[in-house]
Curated annotation (Swiss-Prot):
Family: Belongs to the orthopoxvirus OPG082 family.
Gene name of this polypeptide: OPG082
Highest taxon listed in the record's lineage: Viruses
Keyword Magnesium listed: no
Induction record: Expressed in the intermediate phase of the viral replicative cycle.
Species of origin: Variola virus (isolate Human/India/Ind3/1967)
UniProt-recorded Gene Ontology molecular function terms: DNA binding
GO cellular component: virion component
Name of this chain's protein: Telomere-binding protein OPG082
Length: 382
C-alpha cells in the first residue's frame, strides 16, 4: 500500500511544512492470511516479471484478475470482510504476484497482508467461516513478529492538498489521500475510502478545504494526474489527528460536512472496468467499435450498443501489427482445421485470410477427438 501511495502521489506537489509528532502513538500488529484454492491450476514460471509495480501495473493486475472470475469472487469477498476489521497492506495472487508492492513470492496461491489493532481471534474466526464453503486448503492466519508504531500529529495551520485514486484492494471504492506536511522522510495526513459513486460528492466537499485536488485518471493502458481544483481560500479541515501516510484508511463520513448543492461534471474516472477478450469470442457479423490508446486496443461498442465494461483486445500474431481504431465486422471460420476468425470489413487496415474454402469443415480438437459433439471453451476445442 505504501508503494502504491508513493507512486500515485509522485507527480503532485505536496505540502512540505515540518510537523512534530504528538505523544500519542498508534500500535499495530501484522497478520498474514494465506491459502491455496482448490482445483486451481495455473503456472507462469519462467515468464512472470514485474520489477516496479506502478499504478499502471496495478491496473493491469486488476484486469488480469477479471480472467479468474471464481477466484476473484472469493478474494474480493474476503477483502470486504477484512476492510471492516483491519487495514490491508497488500494482496498476492499467483497470476499477478503482489498487487501493490514488491516482495518475495510465497508458496500459496493467495496471500493477504493486514495490519490490525483489534482481536486476532475475531478476525481469524471470520476468515475461517467465510472461506469454509470454498474448499480452500493450507489456510493459515498468523501474526508476524512485525510491530508497527504509527506517529500521530496535530492538524497544522497549513493548507492540505488531496489526491484521489482507485482503491487498489477493492475498486468499488475510491481512495482519498490528504497531505498536510512532513515528518522526517514521511508525508503526514489522513486517508479515506468511499464508494466510487460518491466521487462527485467527495470532490465538492473537499473543494472549500483543499488548496488543490488531483485525481489519478484511468486512461486504459496508462494513467495521468488531473488537477480538478485549486484555491488559496480554504476552511480548516474538520479533524484533530493526522498520521504518517500508511495503510491506515478510514471510511469517509459525509455527515461531518455540509451537503454539496452543485456538482462539477467529470470527464475522467479513477477506474474503468475492463476485461481481456479474444476476437474469437466476439459475435460474428455485427459492427464492433474499437479505440487504440497508450498501446492498448479496446472495444467500446458492439452492434451500436455501448458496453458497461471495456473489452481489451488480446491480439494473436496474425494481427499483432494492426491498430484497432475504428469499426470492423468479423466472422468465425474453420481454416485449415483451425477454428479462427477473419475480419470481413474494417475502417482500418488489417491482414486478411484470402481463402476460407474447407469442404469438410473439420476442426482439430484438443481432446474428445472421437466425439461427434463439438464446441469450445475459452481456451480449447473439444
Amino acid at each position: 500500500m505504501n508503494n502504491f501511495v508513493k507512486q500515485v502521489a509522485s507527480k503532485s506537489l505536496k505540502p512540505t511544512k515540518k510537523l512534530s509528532p504528538s505523544d500519542e502513538v498508534i500500535s499495530l500488529n501484522e497478520c498474514i492470511i494465506s491459502f491455496n484454492l482448490d482445483n486451481f491450476y495455473y503456472c507462469n514460471d519462467g515468464l512472470f516479471t514485474k520489477p516496479i509495480n506502478t499504478p499502471e501495473d496495478v491496473l493491469k493486475s486488476l484486469l488480469i484478475m477479471e480472467s479468474f472470475a471464481y477466484e476473484k469472487m472469493i478474494i474480493k469477498g474476503l477483502i470486504k470482510i477484512l476492510i471492516s476489521r483491519a487495514y490491508i497492506n497488500d494482496i498476492y495472487f499467483t497470476p499477478f504476484g503482489w498487487l501493490t508492492g514488491i516482495d518475495d513470492d510465497p508458496e500459496t496461491h493467495v496471500v493477504i497482508k493486514i495490519i490490525f489493532n483489534s482481536s486476532l481471534i475475531s478476525i481469524k474466526s471470520q476468515v475461517i467461516e467465510y472461506l469454509k464453503p470454498y474448499n480452500v486448503n493450507n489456510l493459515s492466519v498468523l501474526t508476524t513478529e512485525k510491530e508497527l508504531s504509527i506517529n500521530t500529529f496535530n492538524v497544522p495551520d497549513s493548507i492540505p492538498m488531496s489526491i484521489i485514486s482507485f482503491f487498489p484492494f477493492d475498486t468499488d471504492f475510491i481512495l482519498v489521500i490528504l497531505f498536510f506536511g512532513v515528518y522526517n522522510d514521511s508525508y503526514c495526513g489522513i486517508s479515506y475510502i468511499s464508494p466510487k459513486e460518491r466521487l462527485p460528492y467527495i470532490i465538492e466537499i473537499l473543494k472549500p478545504l483543499m488548496s488543490e485536488i488531483n485525481m489519478l485518471s484511468d486512461e486504459i493502458g496508462r494513467t495521468s494526474s488531473i488537477r480538478i481544483f485549486n484555491s488559496t481560500s480554504v476552511k480548516k479541515f474538520p479533524t484533530n489527528t493526522l498520521t504518517s501516510i500508511c495503510e491506515i484508511v478510514y471510511s469517509f463520513d459525509e455527515s461531518s460536512f455540509p451537503t454539496p448543492k452543485t456538482f462539477t461534471p467529470l470527464n475522467a474516472s479513477p477506474y474503468i472496468p475492463k476485461k481481456i477478450v479474444s476476437l474469437l469470442d466476439l459475435p460474428s457479423n455485427v459492427e464492433i467499435k474499437a479505440i487504440s490508446r497508450g498501446g492498448v486496443d479496446f472495444i467500446t461498442h458492439i452492434n451500436n450498443k455501448r458496453l458497461n465494461t471495456i473489452l481489451v483486445i488480446a491480439k494473436d500474431n496474425f494481427l499483432k501489427n494492426s491498430t484497432f481504431s475504428g469499426t470492423f465486422i468479423k466472422e468465425n471460420i474453420i481454416w485449415k482445421g483451425i477454428y479462427t476468425y477473419r475480419i470481413i470489413k474494417s475502417s482500418f487496415p488489417v491482414p486478411t485470410i484470402k481463402s476460407v474454402t474447407n469442404k469438410k469443415k473439420i476442426c482439430k480438437k484438443h481432446c474428445f477427438v472421437n466425439s461427434q459433439y463439438t464446441t469450445r471453451t475459452l481456451s480449447h476445442i473439444l
